[in-house]
């Protein structure tokens, strides 16, 4: 093993001092910060907010200090349809409602996984994986589908935000504290030879405590409610005693089984045109497992464009923090110039970044437009974010096509856009990925 001796370090000093451009960059960075100093003018010139296909200008939502982007993105796709179908000025579905039931279901999911792994040592990788994060705010498309199909949706006015839904750190801290304690209770009970009936009774007692905790933090979700609205023609409408499930059927009405998750993961362990699932990834026990079809990036973008051309927005997952400017909303591979300013070249490709833990899906948003050239090839993409209207262009972001290539990992599209061969591959027995695989990352 090689140590760092002082002679070597002195050479580094000398090399730095012999490079005036680095010293100029030092002066700029020390006063303005790293990214602000390296931001390029060209990225703003290349990525204006004009698109040949532009589906919506509806006001954006705001997930605030929570990790609910996957829910917001899904509910936003429904919201645009609902606003159009029912002639509304603006409208939001309750993200807190979906949040409550996700926490409830994830708690049960975690306890079931603890029971299933009770024969493993406490230090085993799978048990440690479970205990490291019993639950969190993030999720996947198939997980939110499971929630909508079981619990429906409600208007935001019926089940509004609470402090704990908008800023979820404390809720997560103490829910995970409770779940780790519950895990010990169940493992100790099983170690003593308890019957499955005894374990189930204990688990139900623990779930009552969890339910109480969630209700105190978020409020009790309504079992039925009244809904009234006035449309753009000033016509008054009213529904009484409607359930969340009935509200979904009437006001959203999408058949969610018609949609599939498509990924682009160009690593050698994931051949294209095959389906994948992830071990230990889920929320609703008994719901279909998370499933993806892996395709090449050109095909990935063709599918997204096909759905946008059909007038429907696209839920997608990406690594949003890479080469992006939160304030301007520009996501482009030339947003920052590390080469000219520092002499550093980031040259890992997409597969390398996945393999070496440099990148994974971190955030879900909605594609609501695309700018196509004369040959129908994408130049840039319109993105609806859920960070409020004080960033980007009133909350909308723009992604260059090269940024999409490098940092986008998942889209959700209708099955009708797949070829018969692709649909058969999606429906085939999926390869099971390890729980810690980057494709198991939650948006």
Name the predicted role of every residue range.
Residues 69, 148, 355-388:
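Catalytic nucleophile-His microenvironment captured as a short glycine-rich beta-strand/loop
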Residues 287-362:
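Long, positively charged binding patches that form subdomain-scale interaction surfaces
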Residues 373-443:
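Conserved catalytic-core surface of thiol
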Residues 2-58:
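N-terminal regions that are enriched for targeting/export leaders
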Residues 72, 316-319, 368:
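Short His-Asn-centered micro-motif
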Residues 2-22, 72-75, 88, 405-406, ...:
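Bimodal feature
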Residues 44-314, 391-394, 401, 409:
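Active-site nucleophile-adjacent alpha helix/oxyanion-hole segment immediately C-terminal to the catalytic cysteine
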Residues 320-326, 330-348, 371-374, 381-391, ...:
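Active/binding-pocket-proximal capping segment
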